[in-house]
Amino acid sequence: MINIQNTILGKIVDRKHEELAARLKQRNLQDVEELAKAATPVRGFANALQHKRPGVIAEIKKASPSKGIIRADFNPAEIAQQYEQAGAACLSVLTDVDFFQGADENIAIARNHCALPALRKDFLVDPYNVVEARALHADCILLIVACLSDQQLEEMSKTAFEHQLDVLVEVHDEEELERALKLSEQCLLGVNNRNLKTFDVDLNTTIRLKKLLPASRLLITESGIATPDDVRMMQEHDIHSFLVGESFMKQPRPDQAFTALFGQPQTV
């Protein structure tokens, strides 16, 4: 397991524990469960991803810790509509406030303006955050193996499935992949090509880890997909699912940036 102390991820996780304590004081788990029950029906995230080739999770992100403001003109509703028209399979919506300038309400805003399912992109540290994701109308959650123990991964994925949420489990290396594979095969697997310590991106990370999986297991490549050549390289290694944010968010028209990178995805 990567040691995340003294990394930006470590700082984020520390902040998330503080945030969790504050949120529990504002609203207990029982109240959040009631909100989750009243949320809009779940849209199948994994199903949508599997039925597009390439299957693209298009990200709605205003800022990042490494780049600062990525998109000053930030309109989640408009971006969601553009992504849907361009052929995205799913959305990824940042809800972290302190590091990514996201907001909880952006999930509902994005979903209300398109028919795509949405991932709550955040750094979840407790089952409370999972139930909260459903209360915010998310269809899928992200579990980052580097941030969580095996027990947390098991408990949080179980909570997600109990609430009809799909689960994307993110790994950075072989050791984390081994841990992720202990979880239900229902979980989607994602490889983040960005080194947590250096922030360098190496697309070969996904290709290397793909070889350790059964051919039937869907794998999502995350971070650093910036050119059609990057996309082709992944497809040549039978990787057809992508999570892309920054490449789209930096451009005036995210839909045009999407088409330039992926062409027109086909339903399969």
Swiss-Prot record:
Domain of life (superkingdom): Bacteria
Catalysed conversion reaction: 1-(2-carboxyphenylamino)-1-deoxy-D-ribulose 5-phosphate + H(+) = (1S,2R)-1-C-(indol-3-yl)glycerol 3-phosphate + CO2 + H2O
GO molecular function annotations of the record: indole-3-glycerol-phosphate synthase activity; phosphoribosylanthranilate isomerase activity
Pathway: Amino-acid biosynthesis; L-tryptophan biosynthesis; L-tryptophan from chorismate: step 4/5
PROSITE patterns referenced in this protein's UniProt entry, alphabetically: IGPS
Family annotation (InterPro entries): Aldolase_TIM, Indole-3-glycerol_P_synth, Indole-3-glycerol_P_synth_dom, Indole-3-GlycerolPSynthase_CS, RibuloseP-bd_barrel
Entry EC no(s): 4.1.1.48
Keyword entries, A-Z: Amino-acid biosynthesis, Aromatic amino acid biosynthesis, Decarboxylase, Lyase, Tryptophan biosynthesis
Keyword tRNA-binding: no
Pfam families: IGPS
GO biological process, one term: L-tryptophan biosynthetic process
Keyword Lyase belongs to the record: yes
UniProt cross-references to NCBIfam families, sorted A to Z: PRK00278.1-6 (NF001373), PRK00278.2-4 (NF001377)
Family note: Belongs to the TrpC family.
UniProt name for this protein: Indole-3-glycerol phosphate synthase
Gene name of this polypeptide: trpC
